[in-house]
Amino acid sequence: MNIHEYQAKAVLQPFGVSLSKGVAILKATDAEAAAKQLGGPIWVVKSQIHAGGRGKGKFKEASAGDKGGVRLAKSIEEVKQYAAEMLGATLVTIQTGPAGKQVNRLYIEDGSDIEKEFYLSLLVDRVTSRISFVVSTEGGMNIEDVAHDTPEKIISFSVDPATGIMGHHGRTVAKALGLTGDLAKQAERLVAQLYAAFISKDMEMLEINPLVVTKQGELKCLDAKMSFDGNALYRHPDISALRDETEEDAKEIEASKYDLNYVTLDGTIGCMVNGAGLAMATMDIIKLYGMTPANFLDVGGGANKEKVTAAFKIITADPNVKGILINIFGGIMKCDIIAEGVVAAVKDVGLKVPLVVRLEGTNVEAGKKIIQESGLNVLSADDLDDAAQKIVKAVKEAA
């Protein structure tokens, strides 16, 4: 689960992390009061969306102006102007895709007198089963570009969970960033604070970009990006309460209600598969035959008729879907259950696009019989290769 920047900073505050003061607003009419509360004389008006690259992003609407999603204001009037322009407008960044995201919240923050910018993040390293720090002197930039162009400027290390964070970890960060004296001590404290927050809240990722040194000699987190382990949210009702469903895909939200693993993609062939590995293989073979998947959907091994019906409805709710491929290998999941769910869903919502079903495994003959006797216009496939070719051909012919 992701949260907004202003929420992430609120999570970090109790751990003693050095942050700028800020006020979140939902209405442009609240901008003046927020600016006066902070005092100025410089403010930063930040779009709050679940995507990076806000500063370099562009708004779709001409009324939002030609500046990005993070703007420096030198007067209260500018704060009011930017708030009016940005709220409700659609911001397109390198991470949102061409559709962009609507800005429904702003974070108005005290401006900082910046001397240097750095990058610092913590993430779960699944190879070592440890938390890793990633540090770079190239802050305020897209870290993927830095990793590609100048990998030598990125330093990373992991923390042994048996010992936890230790003094040498902070010194490693300070050395990597070229910090000495009091700034090095601040870096040591910050590393311990961020690690404590990461562990305490079951985070998957914590990114500070940029981490800055101000001209007053203070090490400060100017931005904060967080994601949390969804499997641990039951332990953190305070974090769960921060969820902003307007930032999430409506189909993914609906899928989560049925414990379906669903991810929206930008293709045209909807997929329903059991098992993540088989789902990825199905997506790959669709791509191999010249088309792209519209989603990743793993119904899991214990799906029932209602769950399958819900999955089918979610797929058909996507207007980009021009064909559907159902690929089931019945182990724990029984093919007749899948067939019953598909037939029920088709009769309920109708079938306006080609549908190919490949069933194999437990109760496969019963499953095929249910589909055959349903009278539905469904293409049957014997194996994955056959299924992929049939759905691609059917979609092209229907176009």
UniProtKB/Swiss-Prot annotation:
Pfam family, one: ATP-grasp_2
Keywords of this entry: ATP-binding, Ligase, Magnesium, Metal-binding, Nucleotide-binding, Tricarboxylic acid cycle
Sequence positions that bind ATP: K46, G53, R54, G55, E109, S112, E117
Cofactor remark from the record: Binds 1 Mg(2+) ion per subunit.
Pathway(s) it belongs to: Carbohydrate metabolism; tricarboxylic acid cycle; succinate from succinyl-CoA (ligase route): step 1/1
One term under GO cellular component: cytosol
Cofactor: Mg(2+)
Record's catalysed reaction(s): succinate + ATP + CoA = succinyl-CoA + ADP + phosphate; GTP + succinate + CoA = succinyl-CoA + GDP + phosphate
Subunit record text: Heterotetramer of two alpha and two beta subunits.
HAMAP family: Succ_CoA_beta
PANTHER family: SUCCINATE--COA LIGASE [GDP-FORMING] SUBUNIT BETA, MITOCHONDRIAL, SUCCINYL-COA SYNTHETASE BETA CHAIN
Record function comment: Succinyl-CoA synthetase functions in the citric acid cycle (TCA), coupling the hydrolysis of succinyl-CoA to the synthesis of either ATP or GTP and thus represents the only step of substrate-level phosphorylation in the TCA. The beta subunit provides nucleotide specificity of the enzyme and binds the substrate succinate, while the binding sites for coenzyme A and phosphate are found in the alpha subunit.
Name of this chain's protein: Succinate--CoA ligase [ADP-forming] subunit beta
Designated gene of the protein: sucC
